[in-house]
Amino acid sequence: MADLAKIVEDLSSLTVLEAAELSKLLEEKWGVSAAAPVAVAAAGGAAGAAAPVEEEKTEFDVILTDAGANKINVIKEVRAITGLGLKEAKDLVEGAPKAVKEAVSKAEAADLKKKLEDAGAKVDVK
């Protein structure tokens, strides 16, 4: 049972982006599709992350709400910010609204928001 508790603890500490990547890897490994459960898990993870941010006000999440007309520029900027590969960045942009970066300082969140908006995206900071 201790091993299962460790797995649950490790999974609980994943960011939304890490959880999405884990989901894709498991889908490939097991040959299944988990489209609906992934959306529910991502929404639950985002809601869980939002509560501590409101209490502390020292960490913010940068949420991409819409890619806008210049999707290619937004994908390039997301890649630069997150270090994701082309496919992962494209999936994140096309799956908006999604968290681009979580638990960042207010200054970094403002900087990331400006970069993404300059690329043509609509961004929220929560």
Curated annotation (Swiss-Prot):
Keyword Ribosomal protein on entry: yes
Entry keywords, A to Z: Ribonucleoprotein, Ribosomal protein
Keyword Ribonucleoprotein: yes
GO molecular function term, any single one: structural constituent of ribosome
InterPro entries reported for this sequence: Ribosomal_bL12 (IPR000206), Ribosomal_bL12_C (IPR013823), Ribosomal_bL12_C/ClpS-like (IPR014719), Ribosomal_bL12_oligo (IPR008932), Ribosomal_bL12_oligo_N_sf (IPR036235)
Assigned protein family: Belongs to the bacterial ribosomal protein bL12 family.
Subunit architecture: Homodimer. Part of the ribosomal stalk of the 50S ribosomal subunit. Forms a multimeric L10(L12)X complex, where L10 forms an elongated spine to which 2 to 4 L12 dimers bind in a sequential fashion. Binds GTP-bound translation factors.
Protein name, entry field: Large ribosomal subunit protein bL12
Species per Swiss-Prot/TrEMBL record: Rhizobium meliloti (strain 1021)
Gene name of the encoded protein: rplL
